[in-house]
């Protein structure tokens, strides 16, 4: 029986990589250096090892699959979607619950998004696995991240 070896690489994206300064490109719009949004310690070295594995042993792999985290600019899990009840910004790593939205502590910036946002929060909470976490903008479709 022939052996099947499938490599799965999960979200190997710039926004998750602790890139050394020399690997970070210049932002053509601002002239500043682009920074990863959510760097994971050791990820750059991990991906260098994955690249070496593929280089040296790729012929022995049956398949390679790669997942990507991808978000639109306006995403329910990003600060750009939300505001606090007083109108101020919601900071990354804020957890938002449906009851807080119903009480007016947090609101979508677009009032027309309220019913859908509440339905989503209710579904998350009913499933009992997650509460909504507001993440820094990351892995935006079409961006360097």
Question: Whereabouts are the PLM-identified features?
Answer:
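Active-site acidic carboxylates
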Residues: 1-145
């Amino acid at each position: 029986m022939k052996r099947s070896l499938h490599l799965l690489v999960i979200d190997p994206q710039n926004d998750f990589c602790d890139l050394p300064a020399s690997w970070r490109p210049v932002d053509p719009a601002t002239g500043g250096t682009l920074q990863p949004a959510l760097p994971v310690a050791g990820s750059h070295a991990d991906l260098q090892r994955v690249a070496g594995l593929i280089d040296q042993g790729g012929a022995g792999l049956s398949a390679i699959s790669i997942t990507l985290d991808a978000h639109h600019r306006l995403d329910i899990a990003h600060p750009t979607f939300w505001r606090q009840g007083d109108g101020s910004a919601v900071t990354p790593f804020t957890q938002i619950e449906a009851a807080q939205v119903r009480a007016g502590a947090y609101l979508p910036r677009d009032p027309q998004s309220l019913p859908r946002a509440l339905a989503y929060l209710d579904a998350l909470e009913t499933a009992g696995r997650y509460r909504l976490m507001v993440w820094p903008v990351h892995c935006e479709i079409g961006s360097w991240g």
